[in-house]
Amino acid sequence: CGSVLKYIAVSEAMQGEGGAASIVSELVRHAYTCGRRKLFLFTKPQNEYLFRSLGFFRLAATDGAIYMENSRSGLKNYLDSLEKGRGVQGAIVANCNPFTLGHKYLMETAAAQVDSLHVFILSENSAENAEFSAEARFELVKKGTKHIKNLLLHRSGDYIISHSTFPTYFIKDKADAGRINADLDLTLFGSAIAPALGITTVSYTHLR
């Protein structure tokens, strides 16, 4: 029972009869029985009004997709929980599956160029990250970078979108999926996370 609602569709013959509302309500009810209170969804921009009427709020939107959450304060609470840096600040978003000398070198090099370096480790436990859990990857990076005094380590939470989280069922041209995913992720990071922390330099890596 995950936290992302997806594969929601209503046949053309049934549209306009409240089918989407019934489906979403049932999915939310099921998620709640599994202990999931924070829920997210990806959809086409033209569906925003529909999902807003069902209690979801925009996190980020591009011309190809929109990312929504069933809370007005979820993103703010996440941003408030992040340790703040000082001066010129940079950021790295990494998978680290597992943490390698390549990751270490990248972080050391980036940290030498800024006053504070924010490193976000992807929090998801997916098939792609089956070898090392999110917590194991976080701890490996924590131990491997403790000598970098100006490095601030964060869990990505639900607000940095990886390609394994991003669904593509609503995208007609699957070749566009990677671009739309990246655009949405960068929009959310650039419009909310970076300004909240004062980040001006970003590196995004999925080195394994």
Predicted regions and their residues:
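Conserved acetyl-CoA-binding loop-helix of GNAT-fold acetyltransferases
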Residues: 16-29, 104-106
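C-terminal "cap" of GNAT-fold acetyltransferases
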Residues: 64-84
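Conserved active-site alpha-helix within GNAT-family acetyltransferase domains
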Residues: 44-61
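Histidine-anchored nucleotide/phosphate-binding helix
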Residues: 101-115
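A short, internal acetyl-CoA/4′-phosphopantetheine-binding micro-motif in the GNAT/acyltransferase core
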Residues: 8-16
